[in-house]
Amino acid sequence: MFNWNDYGNGIYGFDSGYVRPLLAAIHLIVEGSRCAIIDTGSNDSVDNIVAALHKVGLSEDAVDYVILTHIHLDHAGGAGLLMQKCPNAKLVVHPRGARHMAEPSKLIEGVSAVYGAEYVQKVYGKIMPIAAERIIEAPDNTIISLNKRELLCIDTPGHARHHICIIDKQTSSIFTGDMFGLSYRELDVNGKAFI
């Protein structure tokens, strides 16, 4: 597991392991014996998510929600595989992303057009569909109750039109996914972002 952080109040975070360290994070919110997972990374991240659950004393059966900030594959590519391992979980996703998680062929086609099919297969593996009845669409101001702990989903288009942020009302913590466009430290010039 990469860069494990216990933030207190049942909030844990760790690196997804996607491409390089500190590029994308996965979070657990634990309330009593129940858990919500925010973002999944790619299929390669799923074993680390399961290990994280076990680290906090929970099994895959304890997961009530897998919440995606958006459906880009660095944040959502492992959702289908994770949902197979978490039989009680519902997937929470922006309404614009829900159909792509139930039937990911157009999503895979679009990513393959940008990066190439070989790269997509190598980095993301097989993207698994999620049964529509396990998907909860989360338009602006949707409240998800995790063992009576309220998680507010807010529509935050910008990085993607299908992007949400999640506010844990108990701690006032916000889980932002990707809030900006692309910016990589390798492209910094004189200590400032080039793009």
Where are these regions (language model features)?
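Active-site neighborhood of phospho(di)ester-bond hydrolases with catalytic His/Asp-centered motifs
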Residues: 38-41, 64-70, 92-94, 156-158, ...
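A short catalytic or substrate-binding loop motif that flags glycine-/basic-rich loops and adjacent residues
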Residues: 19-22, 136-138, 157-160
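Metallo-beta-lactamase
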Residues: 44, 101-155, 161-195
